């Protein structure tokens, strides 16, 4: 029987929590869920040897490349193709043996006896799909829950799911050529810790903060990678309605993939549009320099079945979030990198000729739509450049409060909370936003305060790094801590990248975070109590938008 409870929309019923029958709420079948568990288990085994090899002076970058890529494939709404996971499992087994040999050779060369490891280091995956599925329950996240209890399993899950989010951001940086030995070493250490099957709750919560600290380093690395590769985000008016012509829609998060598509479609008479979390690409100078980057269409991931069906061209998924393609567009959607869906064409060689051919064969937009625009590009480079103006506005009473409202979106009606907060924030407040949660209000009119826009789109979910930088700069300007600022954080979560970001905020000691719309299923009442007492968390948001606004506004500089 499958078991998965890593996303916000996991099944919750009187019978229990977690998706235990196929398909899960994300569309994942039992085979894929089981294979993902095996692959994750093997990643821990690889890390066991990689950490020890590194201690012997042997750091193997290809091994760490595979760890991050492999974990990324197991995120919610990334890869649903069981056959791909069979291949990845086979590859993981080979890579584990390779790093094991490197470790043992290095130990012997230094006159030391190699450790005899256990757990994931020794797990031998079966050769066939049928046999692999028989093995899967033994390595599932909830294996031995009857003996260990749900608190221990939940604390382990918090660490693991945070690491999956870290892996996604690290992979985006690595495809741009940015890697850090410090990051790789810490990732190996955390996965090795999980491989030891820890049971101490307080120790595991401390380790989860290590995941948060690691994610801070990775988000900073990705910010440098994006800025060095494409320039710093600029304030940009981006079109959100189509223009006449052939068209390609690019969704996901990977700016490197978008750059390749833009380069290969130059002078082809094809317009390229972004979708979802790819919206901030339109603010990067070296990407918006392509004249056929025509703007952004659509909204958050959960609306893609309707939006993709209406789009008159091919769609390219560069990362999560993919959901089951509708019949009307399944033959014109493509996946890249870690993404996969059964029966959908996958491009793994960087050649987008099939996408270009599809764009030319499909009708495209037959006329310009009425022009509509929104303003984006308020990353930390932009905001820190006008920090003095913002500080003066606060000192003169023009800006009373800051709200950070964003994160992952989803289908729950309870997520209207975030719309209510943003729309009802008073006229002397500024709303910063990021991630796909912004689509709930980023087309609304917010106006400005003395030329400072009241709605500041900071970027993708990983641009939480920018929000942290800005908050730190404001705290320094006012000679106070971040928790003393007139700043309220309302974080919407859906999948594992949001888990990593949340852990990063906790690692920074930021208190009073509003998290929702529901509690992560793996956080048991015991774990919630420990987190609430230490971090002053408020984990129940439903129906409290107006009350939370009043409470927030009582906290002023």
From Swiss-Prot:
Disulphide bonds in the chain: none
Entry EC number(s): 1.7.99.1
Physiological role: Catalyzes the reduction of hydroxylamine to form NH(3) and H(2)O.
Origin organism lineage: Bacteria, Pseudomonadati, Pseudomonadota, Acidithiobacillia, Acidithiobacillales
UniProt catalytic activity: A + NH4(+) + H2O = hydroxylamine + AH2 + H(+)
Protein name per UniProt: Hydroxylamine reductase
Family named by the database record: Belongs to the HCP family.
Major site of localization recorded for this protein: cytoplasm
């Amino acid at each position: 029987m499958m078991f998965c409870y890593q996303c916000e929309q996991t099944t919750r019923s009187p019978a229990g929590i977690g998706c235990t029958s196929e398909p899960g709420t994300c569309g994942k079948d039992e085979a894929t869920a089981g294979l993902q568990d095996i692959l994750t288990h093997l990643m821990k085994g690889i890390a066991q040897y990689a950490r020890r090899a590194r201690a012997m002076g042997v750091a193997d970058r290809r091994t760490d490349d595979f760890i991050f890529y492999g974990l990324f494939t197991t995120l919610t709404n990334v890869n649903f193709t069981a056959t791909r996971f069979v291949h990845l499992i086979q590859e993981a087994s080979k890579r584990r043996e390779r790093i094991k040999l490197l470790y043992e050779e290095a130990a012997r060369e230094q006159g030391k006896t190699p450790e005899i490891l256990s757990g994931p280091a020794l797990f031998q995956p079966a050769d066939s799909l049928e046999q692999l599925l028989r093995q899967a329950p033994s390595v599932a996240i909830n294996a031995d829950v009857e003996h260990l209890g749900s608190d221990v399993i939940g604390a382990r899950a918090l660490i693991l799911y945070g690491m999956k989010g870290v892996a996604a951001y690290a992979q985006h940086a690595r495809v741009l050529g940015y890697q850090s030995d410090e990051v790789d070493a810490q990732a190996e250490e955390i996965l090795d810790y999980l491989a030891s099957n820890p049971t101490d709750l307080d120790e595991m919560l401390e380790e989860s903060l290590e995941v948060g600290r690691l994610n801070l380093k990775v988000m900073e690395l990705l910010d440098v990678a994006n800025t060095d590769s494409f320039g710093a985000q600029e304030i940009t008016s981006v079109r959100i309605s189509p223009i006449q012509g052939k068209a390609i829609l690019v969704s996901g998060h990977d700016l490197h993939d978008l750059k390749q598509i833009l380069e290969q479609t130059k002078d082809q008479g094809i317009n390229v549009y972004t979708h979802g979390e790819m919206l901030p690409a339109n603010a990067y100078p070296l990407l918006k320099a392509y004249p056929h980057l025509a703007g952004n269409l659509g909204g958050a991931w959960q609306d893609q079945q309707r939006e993709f069906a209406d789009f008159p061209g091919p769609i390219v998924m560069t990362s999560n979030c993919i959901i089951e393609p509708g019949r009307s567009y399944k033959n014109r959607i493509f996946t890249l990198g870690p993404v996969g869906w059964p029966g959908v064409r996958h491009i793994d060689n960087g050649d987008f000729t099939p996408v270009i051919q599809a764009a030319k064969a499909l009708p495209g937009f037959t006329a310009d739509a009425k022009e509509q625009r929104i303003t984006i590009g308020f990353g930390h480079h932009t905001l820190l450049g006008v920090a003095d103006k913002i500080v003066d506005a606060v000192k003169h009473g023009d800006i009373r409060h800051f709200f950070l409202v964003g994160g992952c979106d989803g289908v729950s009606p309870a997520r209207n909370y975030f719309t209510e907060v943003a729309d009802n924030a008073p006229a002397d407040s500024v709303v910063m936003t990021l991630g796909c949660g912004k689509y709930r209000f980023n087309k609304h009119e917010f106006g400005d305060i003395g030329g400072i826009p009241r709605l500041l789109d900071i970027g993708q979910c990983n641009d939480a790094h920018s929000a942290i930088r800005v908050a730190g700069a404001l705290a320094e300007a006012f000679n106070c801590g971040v928790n003393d600022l007139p700043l309220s954080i309302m974080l919407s979560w859906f999948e594992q990248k949001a888990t990593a970001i949340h852990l990063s905020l906790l690692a920074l000691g930021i208190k009073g975070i509003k998290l929702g719309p529901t509690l992560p299923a793996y956080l048991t009442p015991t774990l919630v109590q420990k987190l609430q007492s230490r971090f002053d968390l408020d984990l129940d948001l439903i129906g409290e938008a107006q009350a939370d606004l009043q409470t927030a506004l009582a906290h002023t500089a």
